[in-house]
Amino acid sequence: MTLLTSSLLLFSLLTSRLEAIPVLEKSPAHPAHSAHTAHPAHPSPGVRILRAPESLVAPLGDEVVLECETSLQPERFEWSHRSSRSPGAGFKYLRTGTAKANVSQEAAISRLRVLVRPDTLGEYRCVGWFGPLVVTSTTARLELASTSLVDAQESEAPLQWRVSAGNSVLWSCGQQVQSNPSASWSYFRNGVEIKPEFIGTNGNLFLSNVSSESSGIYSCQATNPASGERIQLPGSMQLQVTPEQRSQSKSPHLLKGQPSSQEITIREGSSLLLQCPGVGSPPPTVVWSSPDVVGAVKNKRSKVFGHALEISNTRVHDAGTYICFQDNGVRPALEHYIKVHVEQPPQIVRPPWADLTNEGDRLKLECEATGVPTPEIYWLLNGHSSVDDTEAELSNNFLILHSVLKRHAGYVQCFARNRLGEHSAGTLLQVNPKQIQEPRESGGTHRPKPNQGSKQKQMYPPTPPNVTRLSDESVMLRWMVPRNGGLPIVIFKVQYRMVGKRKNWQTTNDNIPYGKPKWNSELGKSFTASVTDLKPEHTYRFRILAVYSNNDNKESNTSAKFYLQPGAALDPMPVPELLEIEEYSETAVVLHWSLASDADEHLITGYYAYYRPSSSAGEYFKATIEGAHARSFKIAPLETATMYEFKLQSFSAVSASEFSALKQGRTQRPKTSTTEEPTLQMGDRDTTTPSHNETFNMSPMLTGTIGGGAVLILLLISTCLCVCRRRTSRSRGNNPNKPRMAELRDDFVPLGNCSPTKQRQRTRHIHITLNPLAQQQQQALEEKNDTDQDAPYYQRPSSYDYDPTLRRMSSSSLRRSQRTLERAGGSNGSNNGNNNNLNQSAEAGAVENPGKPGRVLMKRPRLSSRSENLSSGSLNSVGV
């Protein structure tokens, strides 16, 4: 009874259903911050801003157009504005159709037309609504085009410079001009526009290797590229170039009005031109160097043109002090210092990352960015500033939510900004709501059912479903039942309705079983189901109806609005490639896959794995894999030593990719040794479809027990058969009509053939061969007695299994038999009443052949027990 109970318990444990377990890979570190710990792929809503509005500078009264494009068509676009008159105020949504702002939408592109006025200047944002999910663009600035002079003096005297030929001259013409955007410059000599060899920054005119032809009066003009406004600068420069032979030797020096040092600010990626002022006689030679920048001059991006140094594709590490050293052999030499600042637009290198968070928990998000000047970090929660949230706290680069609420669910965005622009990154924040216990009704005549106790279990509903587009007419729903101690759920039903007036809820026909009451993870149990026969270009809502063990039901909260986009209007999702199906165990395999090198993982939320036996043409079983960085996944339980076919597809919040190519793999064959599979992290597994994989697998212990019992039964049957055979042999030996020769053969059947165990020695087959004289006498007797009814005897050759002990025993027995027969022959042929066939044959032979000596054949008495086997080798025919 104890063995039976243990076997049943072991059987129940072995047949328990396993779930699909993901094998997680370590996500690669971000290339820009490999020193930091890398996060997994941050949850993405599947939508993003493809093209944010750009900052513009326009003249007053002009009309500008701001454009915004999203990866998918949203339900609607909105624009927000913050006026430059009140920079401390917040953003306000614009009313469309007004005189100063007009919004139009074409698919996933929105355009805002703005009339440039003092009250329309400021910052603008584009906001895309995807149900309750809000995605906000970076900020675009609208500024007024302007050009003005700073500290202008109308009666400024012109500069008069006298230099020898061969020198290089630098004239700073535009130091008095302030322009937005930066002005373009035109230069004139004696009223005629010239094209300088080098176009400097900030209105600097650089004349290299001047000659007598370079003499004249120089002037400049600034033009605003946005408004076209032109300003003629009042200052001018009169240059006189003398032949080098007539000039006296002078050390390198600066001309009147030339700066003793320079400070230049440039944007990263631009070309930088450094110009060195100073003249001398003879013209000095220039050597460039930098104490701050290693290899500043001797590299592929730098070129030296005498008094000018050009650096292309400027980088942040090019910032520093540059020294222009001039020497013509006349002391002292001249050193000119130029300070270079390289500004860099902001770039987020560590985006925020959030996982499924329980309502009421504390959440800390980090956002790290680079840029020069150091960017400012701010946060938006579904389009709303975190500054206005009472639960939010900003600490350096962190956003801390002291208590996560339902309204925080959605898209959390981090923005980094400086004067060069903005950059943003976001994460999808999912909030697991608290289960609110329904209050009991006070009063009334409600009576509990007989099977209910005083404490009734609550019906905890499932979470709202997440919706993913599968095709133009179908979607995939994913939901979860949080851990709870309420009534068990039996089945689910899916309900959906088209958004609009007088649209009723429709229920699918499929009953989705809950499966075994086992939690997939600490958060609960996950489920998936598909809904078909939908109409593209329509908006739907979905909810899950749970049916409980008390035959009551309760529905989940409604999902967000989902717009079923046609496939032609969607960007294709990256298609995973199945690389290998690893035989993990007898009931599990591990899928390994990869993505193309140019695939955008930010579009991916997870993967769907489909599988079925290769011999089946039925529906596929499904498993959900969360995370874009996953590259392997364990599928279990499966049937032992069975071939399966697998395929994968990636998915996001709004679409799914094409299927990967089918790939086959099998589970391992049963093993004789007992092994235990390692326990891995549980993953999401589709439990909505009844699985044929719920068949049980025998454990090695149970298999050994059953096998041992079968062996014992076989041994018992063999023993019974041997006993019956011996009894049959004995009954045959008692038959008086049986020929004596046949009886003689039966007497020497070895008892070893009936042994039930294998501990005996190999069976020895002993055969009796009559001597030739006896055979002749027997043949003569048979010819004489034609009517004899005895069956003929067919002789078999003797065969021995060599055993020296038996051979010695057989020889001694033969000698004893010979002596006995000799004594019997000497007693006048008396046979002591033993009138058997052997004696009759001998007598017949003696009568027919009187001249031949008589031959007597005798059978010795029957031997009992094992002595019969041991002495049987001596009973060959003996002649006397």
From Swiss-Prot:
Biological processes per GO annotation: axon guidance; compound eye development; cuticle pattern formation; homotypic cell-cell adhesion; maintenance of protein location in extracellular region; segment specification; smoothened signaling pathway; wing disc anterior/posterior pattern formation
Cysteine disulfide partners in this protein: 68-126, 173-220, 276-324, 367-414
Region: Disordered, residue numbers: 426-467, 662-697, 728-762, 775-880
Domain Ig-like C2-type: 45-142, 132-232, 252-340, 346-432
PROSITE patterns: FN3, IG_LIKE
Record's GO cellular component terms: axon; cell surface; cytoneme; membrane; plasma membrane
Record Pfam families: fn3, Ig_2, Ig_3
Signal peptide (residue range): 1-20
GO MF annotation list: coreceptor activity; hedgehog family protein binding; heparin binding; patched binding; protein homodimerization activity
Keyword terms of this UniProt record: Disulfide bond, Glycoprotein, Heparin-binding, Immunoglobulin domain, Membrane, Proteoglycan, Repeat, Signal, Transmembrane, Transmembrane helix
Extracellular side: 21-703
UniProt free text on domains: The first fibronectin type-III domain mediates a specific interaction with Hh protein, in vitro. The second fibronectin type-III domain is additionally required for in vivo signaling activity.
Subunit note: Homodimer. Heterotetramer; 2 iHog chains bind 2 hh chains when facilitated by heparin, heparin is required to promote high-affinity interactions between hh and iHog.
Protein name as it appears in the record: Interference hedgehog
Organism: Drosophila sechellia (Fruit fly)
Name of the gene encoding the protein in the UniProt record: iHog
